[in-house]
Amino acid sequence: MDYDFTSAARHFAAKNAFTTGPHELAGMIGAKADIVIVDVRYPADFRASRIPGAINLPKGKWEKPAGLSKEKLNVLYCYNPQCHLASEAASALLALGYPVAEMEGGFSTWEAFGSPVETPAATAVAA
């Protein structure tokens, strides 16, 4: 077998530096890390349910992003493991100078882990 260990090591080191998972993100939220959570799904899906504290930045809003920070890590997520919206948004936002990471697995994985979800009813009760 011809395997390039050096390239593989670089690939996984880079991947680990710029991605997170639901468990890690929940830990960041619990520790009140100085991050911005960015949901890049369609607005209707965002309104229905989202990661608590997330802002919505759907495709079409990436060129002039509102609510992001160039001083904080912006953690992006989309629908599911097959969705590429978060990585597309990451590329666009990086080009504008925003530090980003992607939560792998998307919102469906967040829910599958039993992580907290914010919904209109939950938001209304919390207010």
Where are these regions (language model features)?
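Short, flexible helix/strand-to-coil boundary loops that buttress conserved ligand/catalytic motifs
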Residues: 29, 50, 114
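Flexible, polar/low-complexity N-terminal or interdomain linker segments that lie immediately upstream
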Residues: 1-36, 43-45, 119-127
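Glycine-rich, highly charged phosphate/nucleotide-binding loops
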Residues: 55-63
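Short active-site oxyanion
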Residues: 32-37, 52-53, 73, 99
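Catalytic cysteine-centered active loop of the rhodanese-like fold, especially the PTP/DSP P-loop
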Residues: 63, 68-111
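Acidic/glycine-enriched edge-of-secondary-structure segments
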Residues: 42-56
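Terminal peptide-recognition signature
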Residues: 39, 54, 93
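Short, hinge-like loop/turn segments at secondary-structure boundaries
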Residues: 55, 73, 117-121
